[in-house]
């Protein structure tokens, strides 16, 4: 009898979490787009502009071209993203951090907090080296993500990502928190695919397409031929 009760309890809990998982993964309830979406920053980035509280935004910088694209995106939407905002800046190389620090000086009203993330995988790394760095990144990123997510509670917030594989780890931790802690609400993860991806998505894009709340591409061909759930607003960077 006790075994039957325990089995029933496990089944109920498992069913509840499956339903919750379906609810937090936008892929299951987002319709495919067929036309160009309105290039409206509020709709594009899912921000509650009417809120009187400052926006809390997490931005992750990859390296090289990814950093350049992210900075141009922030600059193009500066009125929405950088107006009296609190920016949580994640980075994996010092050059990107310095580049952002130089850029953000123009917006003295923004508060910035820096978080260094290990790279999920180094270029030309062996399998063993990759496994080691991935485990280290998982642990370190979990600590950072938990701190940042709880700091955002009660305020309009956004996780803005593009580029490297570390974005996958960050997104997965956020979705796990949504799954286990429903009262936290949505993390509002927006992933912007690189301008260089015209016909096929990046490996990171292929993974995050199933996970993030909003997936944005910059070429119609990519949306129409490969990623029907994505949004296309034209060139953003």
Curated annotation (Swiss-Prot):
Keywords: Endoplasmic reticulum, Membrane, Nucleus, Transmembrane, Transmembrane helix. Pfam families: Alg14 (PF08660). It comes from Saccharomyces cerevisiae (strain ATCC 204508 / S288c) (Baker's yeast). Gene3D superfamilies: Glycogen Phosphorylase B. The chain crosses the membrane at residues 8-28. The keyword Endoplasmic reticulum applies. Its main location: endoplasmic reticulum. Involved in protein N-glycosylation. Essential for the second step of the dolichol-linked oligosaccharide pathway. Anchors the catalytic subunit ALG13 to the ER. InterPro entries: Oligosacch_biosynth_Alg14 (IPR013969). This is UDP-N-acetylglucosamine transferase subunit ALG14. Residues 29-237 are cytoplasmic. GO terms for molecular function: protein-membrane adaptor activity. It is found in: Endoplasmic reticulum membrane; Nucleus membrane. Present with 339 molecules/cell in log phase SD medium. One of its GO terms (biological process) is dolichol-linked oligosaccharide biosynthetic process. Belongs to the ALG14 family. Residues 1-7 are lumenal. GO terms for cellular component: cytoplasmic side of Golgi membrane; endoplasmic reticulum membrane; lipid droplet; nuclear membrane; nuclear outer membrane-endoplasmic reticulum membrane network; peroxisome; UDP-N-acetylglucosamine transferase complex. Disulfide bonds: none annotated.
């Amino acid at each position: 009898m006790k075994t039957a009760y325990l089995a029933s309890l496990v089944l109920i809990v498992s069913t509840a979490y499956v339903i919750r998982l379906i609810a937090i993964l936008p892929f299951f309830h987002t319709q495919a787009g067929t036309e160009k979406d309105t290039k409206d920053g509020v709709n594009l980035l899912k921000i509650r502009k009417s809120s009187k509280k400052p926006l809390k935004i997490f931005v992750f910088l990859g390296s090289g071209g990814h950093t350049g694209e992210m900075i141009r995106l922030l600059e193009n939407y500066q009125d929405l993203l950088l107006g009296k905002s609190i920016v949580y800046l994640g980075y994996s190389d010092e050059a990107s951090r310095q580049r952002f620090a130089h850029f953000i000086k123009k917006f003295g009203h923004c508060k910035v907090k820096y978080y260094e993330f290990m790279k999920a995988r180094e270029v030309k790394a062996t399998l063993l080296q990759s496994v080691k760095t991935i485990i280290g990144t998982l642990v370190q990123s979990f600590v950072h993500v938990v701190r940042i997510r709880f700091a955002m509670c009660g305020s309009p917030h956004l996780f803005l990502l593009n580029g490297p594989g570390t974005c996958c780890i960050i997104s997965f931790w956020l979705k796990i928190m949504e799954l286990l802690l429903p009262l936290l609400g949505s993390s509002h993860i927006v992933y912007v695919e690189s301008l260089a991806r015209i016909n096929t998505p990046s490996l990171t894009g292929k993974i995050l397409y199933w996970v993030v709340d909003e997936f944005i591409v910059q070429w119609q061909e990519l949306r129409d031929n490969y990623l029907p759930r994505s949004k296309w607003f034209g060139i953003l960077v």
